Swiss-Prot record:
Its main location: cytoplasm. Residues 1-75, 138-196, 302-325, 581-601 are annotated as: Disordered. Keywords: Cytoplasm. Residues 361-506 form the cDENN domain. It comes from Emericella nidulans (strain FGSC A4 / ATCC 38163 / CBS 112.46 / NRRL 194 / M139). This is Protein mesA. Required for the formation of actin cables at hyphal tips. Involved in establishment and maintenance of hyphal polarity axes. Stabilizes the localization of the formin sepA at sites of polarized growth. Belongs to the AFI1/mesA family.
Length: 791
């Protein structure tokens, strides 16, 4: 039996078990003076193989709470809601043939037109994606709401009835699970209206000389609530081919039953912080412990009680167990059985808002970057769009247009409709960064001239078209992205940016001019150079998405600083306890000298005040333009709803003070205050998760934190070492410890040796609040990892 995790209650205190920890059977090893000298640089690396001691400890920890599934077996929600078939009739035009298992919409003509794009007869195959709002109806919506409320009440009642025998700790644990589930549900709902139905559509054209015009055109679509609808492409190819041979509802029934029989229940449900950590890392076994626990739970449910807990199923073994661990925890591997044909599918473990389908940010960036690099063309100036002058990078112009809710059209003349749809989806992900919402709900991955009136009634739409007529009507759009030429145009009919309080504020201030003609106060030029350099160096899609997520995160933090500077407070940032609203509040001071965690400071960090003023002045129009959009108001809702899940530690502001370590030249006293505050505040699982979200691998990981091991104050060095030990024993933190450089690890072991020699404390973690599994020193973890690699 492993040590219970400390559970953070609503008041920020830890609820710890007082039961003594038990040994895991491994020898307790103390750091020896010869260890650092004799072992190779990988001797202190805990990454190793999955059977390392740190991995065993982390997996044991998760047995304290049952791991939930993202898609439970008993869930009433189906993977696929509807299957549609349309065809082109020579006399009647696009017509609907079937809607299975029932009609999704009474407007069959509109659906048929969406499923059969323009010029589809000139291509043998084409893919399109479009969205439909799921009309649940008023009465059904009330029933669904009542059912959800009853479900939550029932869960609370079960918690209360089961907590009587388990004491306060169990009650707090279970109540936190209920709250977490409700917050996750609220996050998925989004509060933007009825849920969207994502439609993946395949169009096939088969030559047939026996019919008029010599071809038969049919389209089949799958309607799902899952945004990862691209996984259904292989089975849709097979099903449409079968439908050409057997055009009957039975063919659709076979497809419907096959896709809904797909088992995704072994996929664990990660909380918000865990999803952020997984998305930002390249480690293929991050949170593998949760997948192992799901396999064990399913084996117990299925009656397979003889499973070896120390050796769960692995995809590398010769036998083929029913449930296997994924090769990469970023994706869950399952299969769909269609007509006795197993079709493998990979479902993303982490799903962010506005991320729909399978697209490539790399491809989108390359399309519009290459012509600009070869022959730059100046844009007409617009305060919301050209934040770096007339030669602002086209991708930045596109992102600015979407952030400020401009009408954006992607034109792909003589291109497949699937290509323009992919560009629209990539643009939504680009501007969202997985953080902001409000783009896909107003996106039209493919549309045509017949729907122009409906399109123009949507403010700030993002549309994909193939008809060149759109290029000749600049009054229909604000920004036109021409895919064949790779050029972006700003319409001469675009509305001018209004004068705002923010602009007046900075005009009244003493001017802070940029130094030199090539100055980049917003940092956008430097950022795009970094992105293009990463693409040229073959960085993967995940790395580029992580960079854009960091860019949008920075944008929201700069916007919060702008609001505090101009308006005195921000709508998009919640300050922690004992913090002052004034933007001039000095950072680094402690409101309570006896509590290191009361160190003040919040928000984005600039190297100096002049840099801050230059960037805010350069970004004022873009920020003010964003503050009037639906994505801004959705972000305010998200900040309020996700405050507790994303910030289990309210004080200090971990992101702000870690940025101070990265950006500023701090004195020994100032840096020591940060290290002590972190060591005192970060004690439990959730706190370490929060820290890891602000120390991603792409930004040096734990490097700046490890510099506390070299601090001149002994107390700071020891506190930093204790914090790193807690991180190394954390299921996700062990990966960050493994990537820490040899120099920092040498300093860590030196501090542990000094503590042992002085007799002040043992190098073994003793407190339950400092441990995430059976007790073991970090040296033992490192040596066990070496033995595992050697075996």
């Amino acid at each position: 039996m492993s040590i219970p995790l400390p559970i953070r209650t609503s008041d920020g205190t830890g609820n710890l078990s007082s039961s003594p920890p038990k040994s895991n059977g491994l020898p307790r090893l103390s750091p020896s003076p010869s260890f650092v000298q004799k072992h190779s640089p990988r001797s202190s690396d805990t990454s190793g193989l999955r059977r390392s001691a740190s991995h065993h400890n982390a997996r044991q920890t998760f047995k304290q709470r049952r791991c939930k599934s993202q898609y439970p077996r008993d869930s009433p929600e189906r993977h696929v809601e509807f299957i549609l078939v349309a065809s082109f009739h020579i006399d009647r035009g696009p017509i609907m043939e079937h809607q299975y298992p029932g009609p999704i919409s009474s407007d069959e003509g509109m659906l048929a037109e969406l499923m059969l794009p323009d010029q589809t007869h000139v291509r043998s195959q084409d893919w399109t994606i479009f969205f439909l709002p799921l009309d649940t109806g008023g009465e059904g919506e009330e029933d669904d709401l009542a059912g959800e409320n009853n479900k939550r009440k029932g869960k609370r009642n079960r918690v209360r009835s089961s907590s009587g025998d388990e004491g306060t700790s169990a009650d707090t644990n279970n109540e936190s699970e209920v709250t977490e589930e409700e917050e996750s549900s609220d996050e998925e709902d989004g509060g933007e209206g009825p849920p969207l139905m994502y439609v993946l559509n395949l169009v096939n054209t088969k030559q047939d000389n026996t019919v008029k015009r010599g071809a038969v055109v049919k389209a089949m679509a799958i309607c799902t609530r899952h945004s990862f609808l691209h996984i259904y492409k292989p089975i849709l190819l097979l099903a449409l081919e079968d439908y050409f041979k057997n055009p009957y509802p039975e063919t659709l029934e076979t497809l419907y039953n096959a896709v809904n029989a797909m088992d995704l229940s072994p996929m664990p449900k990660l909380n918000l912080l865990e999803r952020q950590i997984l998305q930002a890392t390249n480690s293929k076994d991050m949170f593998i412990e949760k997948f192992e626990q799901m396999v064990q739970q399913r084996a117990i449910e299925d009656g397979e009680n003889d499973i070896d807990e120390d050796n769960p199923p692995s995809p590398r073994r010769g036998t083929a167990p029913r449930y296997t661990l994924p090769r990469d925890t970023h994706e869950f591997e399952s299969k769909i059985i269609y007509n006795d044909i197993p079709i493998p599918v990979k479902v993303p473990t982490v799903i962010w808002p506005e991320i729909v389908g399978d697209f490539s940010l790399v491809k989108l960036i390359q399309i519009f970057s290459a012509p600009h690099a070869a022959s730059p063309q100046p844009f007409p100036l617009h305060p919301h769009l050209t934040t770096s002058g007339p030669l602002t990078h086209p991708i930045i112009v596109l992102v600015n247009a979407m952030l400020t809710q401009k009408r954006v059209v992607f034109l792909g003349h003589n291109r497949p409709s699937g290509e323009v749809a992919e560009a629209v989806l990539a643009a939504c992900a680009l501007a969202s960064g997985g953080i902001l919402r409000g783009f896909t709900r107003h996106a039209f991955p493919y549309t045509d001239l017949t729907k122009i009136d409906d399109l123009l009634r949507v403010p700030g739409f993002i549309a994909g078209v193939t008809n060149p007529t759109f290029a000749n009507h600049p009054e229909w759009w604000d920004v036109l992205c021409d895919l064949p030429t790779g050029r972006i145009k700003i319409s001469n009919h675009i509305e001018p940016a209004p004068v705002t309080d923010g602009q007046l504020y900075f005009q009244q201030q003493s001017p802070v001019s940029a130094s030199g003609p090539n100055a980049d106060p917003t940092g956008d030029n430097l950022f795009m150079e970094d992105v293009l350099r990463s693409i040229a160096n073959r960085y993967g899609e995940n790395a580029i998405r992580a960079k854009w997520r960091a860019y949008i995160t920075k944008f929201t933090r700069v916007a919060a600083a702008f609001e505090e500077t101009v308006y005195g407070a921000s709508n998009i940032y919640i300050i922690g306890p004992n913090e002052e609203l004034s933007p001039d509040s000095p950072s680094g001071l402690q409101s309570d000298p006896g509590d290191p965690t009361t160190i003040r400071g919040h928000g984005y960090v600039w190297p100096d005040e002049a840099s801050k003023q230059r960037e805010l002045m350069a970004s004022v129009s873009r920020i003010e333009g964003w503050r009037t959009t639906r994505s801004y108001y959705s972000f305010i809702q998200d900040i309020a709803a996700m405050y507790w899940p994303s910030r289990p530690i309210q004080k200090p502001d971990l992101h702000h003070h870690h940025d101070r370590l990265r950006t500023l030249k701090l004195s020994a006293y100032e840096a020591g205050a940060i290290y002590l505050a972190f060591a005192h505040a970060i004690k439990d699982y959730a706190g370490i998760c929060q820290l890891l979200t602000v120390t991603p691998e792409s930004q040096a990981g734990l490097f700046y934190l490890s510099m506390g091991l070299l601090h001149p104050d002994r107390n700071v060095r020891e506190a930093t070492a204790d914090l790193l030990e807690r991180i190394a024993l954390h299921p996700a933190g062990r990966h960050f410890w493994a990537q820490l450089n040899r120099f920092a690890k040498t300093a860590y072991f030196r501090i542990k040796r000094e503590k042992e020699a002085a007799g002040n404390s043992s190098p073994i973690v003793k407190s339950p609040s400092d441990s995430f599994g059976p007790q073991q020193s970090l040296v033992g973890v490192a040596i066990s990892g070496v033995h595992s690699q050697g075996s």
